[in-house]
């Protein structure tokens, strides 16, 4: 573990990673650390500095993204979303083909609404039971599940438009 980080303000790391909408801070910092060959916990400690939570300003400098972009895309930067246990419990990996399409080779964990259970673009199950990429089953032979998921999503949007 790196314990002797410089006391100077952080500079952007050499490698950046894509920040996905509703991605957890834990997932983003893990991917950023792996891209730069740094232990993830060391990067989180450096981004947090004195507090136990990642500081949005420090993370913005390290990642190369503007602060407002990170605050808009990442979940876990505000006081009510910071709890790491809550982030792990609420997060699910998004469709592995969607991440591969954007050139991301590792899982991206996002806070997905409960009604979002299928990636319709790739026909993959991404519901709450899909906690790993291996759990994302193809629905090619289960068209009724995909149709039901689409109807459920439309119903949720109609009755709760802010979702």
What is each PLM-predicted segment?
Residues 12, 120-163:
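Domain-exit/linker segments immediately C-terminal to small folded modules
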Residues 100-104, 124-127:
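Short functional micro-motifs and their immediate structural scaffolds
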Residues 49, 79, 115-118, 139:
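Solvent-exposed, non-transmembrane amphipathic alpha-helical segments
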Residues 106-115:
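Short linker/helix segments within small regulatory modules
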Residues 101, 112-113, 120:
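A contiguous catalytic/ligand-binding core that recognizes phosphate-bearing ligands
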Residues 44, 107, 130-132:
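Short linear functional motifs in flexible/disordered or boundary regions
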Residues 94-98, 118-121:
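Short, cysteine/histidine-rich loop/knuckle motifs that typically chelate Zn2+
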Residues 1-91, 110:
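A structured, charge-rich N-terminal accessory region that forms the first stable segment of a protein
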């Amino acid at each position: 573990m790196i314990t002797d980080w410089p006391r100077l303000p952080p500079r952007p790391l050499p490698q950046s990673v894509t920040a996905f909408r509703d991605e957890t801070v834990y997932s983003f910092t893990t991917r950023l650390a792996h891209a730069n060959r740094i232990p993830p916990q060391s990067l989180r400690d450096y981004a947090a500095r004195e507090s136990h939570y990642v500081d949005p300003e420090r993370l913005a400098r390290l990642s190369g993204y503007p602060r407002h972009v990170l605050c808009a895309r990442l979940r876990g930067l505000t006081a009510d979303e910071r709890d790491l246990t809550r982030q792990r419990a609420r997060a699910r990996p998004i469709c592995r083909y969607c991440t591969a399409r954007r050139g991301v080779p590792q899982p991206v964990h996002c806070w997905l609404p409960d009604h979002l259970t299928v990636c319709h673009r790739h026909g993959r199950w991404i519901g709450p039971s899909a906690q790993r990429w291996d759990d994302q089953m193809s629905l090619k032979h289960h068209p009724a599940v995909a149709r039901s998921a689409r109807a459920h999503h439309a119903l949720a949007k109609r009755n709760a438009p802010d979702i």
